[in-house]
Amino acid sequence: MWPKILLRGGRVAAGLCPALGPRLAARFPPQRTPENRLAPQRNLHATAARALPLIPIVVEQTGRGERAYDIYSRLLRERIVCVMGPIDDSVASLVIAQLLFLQSESNKKPIHMYINSPGGVVTSGLAIYDTMQYILNPICTWCVGQAASMGSLLLAAGTPGMRHSLPNSRIMIHQPSGGARGQATDIAIQAEEIMKLKKQLYSIYAKHTKQSLQVIESAMERDRYMSPMEAQEFGILDKVLVHPPQDGEDEPELVQKEPGEPTAVEPAPASA
């Protein structure tokens, strides 16, 4: 069986899934699998388990009368895709479908992806990542709230120069984790697979941050939390915004570094 490899702090609760229609927003009870016990309680950015909130409905006046959209479908018309909550196969399926649909409409117009996620299943996140790299559209990523674990990888995977964060967001990177059960041979097979995924994730972060593999390995050895400014210096994002462009302005207002604020110290390479 293919092992479900998660990044720590991944599947901690049922979250709000981006929906193409109101019927797609459903409550998924937590499954009693070993993965649900992997999320450490010390994770400050874990999403509390709760019932899904109601999805707002937007009513528009058209020449043929009123037309109602759920809020995510209305945002999709503006080429906005939301990645909210833990990333699993169902969230990945919805996000991939939206990306492919927007490319079919136009492969030149940018797509805006808003991320507020504690992370999740590695293979689900990589499915979204591969689709982002596959389509021809420029993808503008935005971190609102948090982009932890696989969420930070999707944030970094945006088009260079178009990766953004709001000023009070948090970004976190770390190595993958997983649970293995069964016979010793089965555990060894799954351990080998997670080590391969670890190297694969390191190379992806190195590609998009322009950091060396040695720096990436040292930074991701344990949970590494960053402010947006620190993530910008590390190479995960490009701009920290206060608000979008106003009328008559060409550029949005950027967060400027405070005088005397210490720079992010790069982790020293681990010595043998």
UniProtKB/Swiss-Prot annotation:
Signal peptide boundaries: none
UniProt protein name: ATP-dependent Clp protease proteolytic subunit, mitochondrial
Subunit structure: Fourteen CLPP subunits assemble into 2 heptameric rings which stack back to back to give a disk-like structure with a central cavity. Component of the ClpXP complex formed by the assembly of two CLPP heptameric rings with two CLPX hexameric rings, giving rise to a symmetrical structure with two central CLPP rings flanked by a CLPX ring at either end of the complex.
Record GO terms (molecular function): ATP-dependent peptidase activity; ATPase binding; serine-type endopeptidase activity
EC numbers: 3.4.21.92
InterPro entries: ClpP (IPR001907), ClpP/crotonase-like_dom_sf (IPR029045), ClpP/TepA (IPR023562), ClpP_His_AS (IPR033135), ClpP_Ser_AS (IPR018215)
Subcellular location: Mitochondrion matrix
Reaction equations catalysed: Hydrolysis of proteins to small peptides in the presence of ATP and magnesium. alpha-casein is the usual test substrate. In the absence of ATP, only oligopeptides shorter than five residues are hydrolyzed (such as succinyl-Leu-Tyr-|-NHMec, and Leu-Tyr-Leu-|-Tyr-Trp, in which cleavage of the -Tyr-|-Leu- and -Tyr-|-Trp bonds also occurs)
GO cellular component, one term: mitochondrial matrix
List of residues that carry N6-acetyllysine: 207
Species annotation: Bos taurus (Bovine)
Classification via SUPFAM superfamilies: ClpP/crotonase (SSF52096)
CDD domains linked: S14_ClpP_2
Annotated gene: CLPP
HAMAP family cross-referenced by the UniProt entry: ClpP (MF_00444)
Stated family: Belongs to the peptidase S14 family.
Residue positions, PTM N6-succinyllysine: 196
Keyword check for Hydrolase: yes
KW Aminoacyl-tRNA synthetase (keyword) present: no
